[in-house]
Amino acid sequence: MEQTKNEIRLASDLQSDSIVDGPGLRTVIWTQGCGHKCKGCQNPQTWDFNGGGLVPLKLVKEAIDELECQTGITFSGGDPMFQPYQCTELAKYCKKKGYNIWVYTGFTYEQLMEMSKKDKIYLDFLKYIDVLVDGPFILKERNLSLLFRGSNNQRLIDVPKTLKENKIVLFDESIYLEEDKLKRKKTYI
């Protein structure tokens, strides 16, 4: 069965209450299909473009409507950029609901901007993203101390500021770390 723009190939159901895929309590949309095949990838089961299952976007939106106590939505996989039309539609929907949007991709921001010259859907998708975690996972650069990413080459890009300033602007991790420290301190007081 061939995929249409009204359905997305997902690796699994939406995963709520994630605390490792961006700040706050998040729901992860696990897309299926990835051509990067990074050595040491934590999700190799999501590489197969015919794996997972096709889900109508309407059903994914209904699942998003039922979410409770979530501060953000993270697109991961697989690589969401291999399903840009579907992910753009869902990101737009999530943004209207007030969610903070993070996207993990093996493409670099610069590659996505090049791809946007041939198909503007990539730029359209970027416009709904708050933070892009870009670049492939590189096993030789693995670093377990990094916030929300696995290897030194990957960046946390503040997409709205990057698009506005027309240069890469990194997400200010210190703001998150200070907020997190304050939350933990209040828990113990």
Predicted regions and their residues:
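Short, conserved loop/helix-junction motifs that constitute active-site signature segments
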Residues: 124-127, 150
